[in-house]
Amino acid sequence: MNIRVLQLGKFHPIKGGVEKVMYAFTLGLSLRGISCDMLCASDDDDVGETRLNAHARLIKTKTLAKLAATMISPEMISVLRGICHDYDIIHIHYPDPMATLALFLSGYKGKVIVHWHSDIVKQKILLQFVKPLLNWLIRRADLILGTSPVYVSDAPMLKSVQAKVDYLPIGVRERAPDASLVAMIRNQYPGKKIVYSMGRLVAYKGYEYLIEAAMMLPDDYVILIGGSGPLKGKLQSMVRKYQLQQKVFILGFIPREVESAYYGACDVFCLSSVMKTEAYAIVQVEAMSCGRPIVATRIPGSGVSWVNEHGISGLNITPGVPEEIADAVQKICEDPYVYEKYSMGALYRYHRLFTLEAMTDGLIKHYKKLLEE
């Protein structure tokens, strides 16, 4: 079956989880010989069309403004209207009001899949403005895919349409850390157990609780936080306030070429997120692929604690409680038997559920089933 698909949604260049998923879908499908293009609003001045391979194009439209994490790109509307009829399936990635508006105005008559990455949690005012458009999108969708069974069953806007809801776990390529880079990182913290976290420095990540947990850890632990964002200054001030300059390190943006090395260098990966905005957390899957035990949070309605199976790939704790973070980290790190159990459990869970191949296989099955209906 010759399938033609368009991934529609979040902006380029790739920084966050949704963009990573769109790009992984585009590459994974195209490398299987399926025609798959990606249309998105550009977050910089790089616009136009780029040929990724024989079966995939990246199409970036000009952004005029950014409002409540939404790219305002009128050009996306005209571009989509011009190309939409070339595709059997449009796979739109939610939440993205701009992409939803473009689809609404496109006149597209083919199959639509909505990938429900997250509810709109923080931007309550935005939600009220776009709710009629979102209700249309839910009605228009032939299939709604979530990233975990927990999230889509709990999403308020999907309660009445569960018959057309399914889930597909996000998979990632197995990380292969460069041994020399791993050694270089570990040599910067000699004799220390390394707790690593990576993500945007924003409120829902709960990094302030991870920093507070450092005060409860012995001196042979260090906490490394990779990523950039608006709360960087506030978090650095916390580190100074609590005199943790030798124990907590805000690393800033981690280049892609050294991402794997930090996973390989750490002893434990910690996800301290506190809000349902954190629906899945691809970073913990990436850490699992390196055999790293996970400490994550039990956020009601989120898939985070489903990804990290408690007692198998690591431990899940109450959000916003630094004492529980410190306790879980030590439970994993202080007993070699426990550490090995969770390390092997993380690797096993990755290979069973979260490989790039498994995700691509699942996606193709959904596409074929939809087109056969």
For the regions a language model picked out, list residue spans one by one:
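N-terminal strand-loop element at the rim of the active site
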Residues: N2, Q7-M71
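Conserved donor-binding/catalytic core segment of Leloir-type glycosyltransferases
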Residues: L6, M184-M215, L224
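Donor nucleotide-sugar binding/catalytic pocket of nucleotide-sugar-dependent glycosyltransferases
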Residues: C40, L134-S180
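Short His-centered aromatic/hydrophobic patch
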Residues: I92-A99
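Short alpha-helical donor nucleotide-sugar binding micro-motif in glycosyltransferases
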Residues: I138, F253-I254, A261-C266
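Nucleotide-activated donor-binding/catalytic signature segment of Leloir-type glycosyltransferases, i.e.
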Residues: K234-I254
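Short hydrophobic beta-strand element within catalytic cores of glycosyltransferases
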Residues: S289, P293-R298
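Conserved acidic donor-binding segment of nucleotide-sugar-dependent glycosyltransferases
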Residues: E309-P322, K331-Y337
